[in-house]
Amino acid sequence: RVPINKRPCQCALPNDSRCANCTNVAGLPKSTVDYLRQLQDYCSDQETLDCKFVLSGGTETHLHSENTRHRPGNPVVDVVPNTQTQAVYKSLINAAGGVTTVARCENEKGEHIPACSVPQTNHIHFEFRW
């Protein structure tokens, strides 16, 4: 089971505080869940690097930018490692390299952080292959 950082969203209104602070997974493709489990397995096998993570972004369209790919049916998620270091971010990105079309560090606004610098990096944005 892939851990999720927050409760499911109760509504989808962009500027309504009742619809904030949530993470949806309904509508994620099965392949995306399978890829996340593969990443979990990779992290479990690491002896020197604790790269376990939680899912922090899924299909909650209303919490992302207007042109977001975070939508039901899309293989797009955000993850936050339990240990937030540059080495862990890069390790997860490298581990997912064969099954993603996009794997990058982003800040809390969804802006790309090229070097995965800490503390600027807030999460990893993954767009998995179909």
Segments (PLM) and residue ranges:
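Active-site nucleotide-donor binding segment shared across nucleotidyl transfer reactions
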Residues: 53-68
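Short glycine-rich, low-complexity/disordered patches
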Residues: 42-56, 100-112
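Catalytic cores and adjacent binding grooves of peptidoglycan-active enzymes
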Residues: 26, 64-130
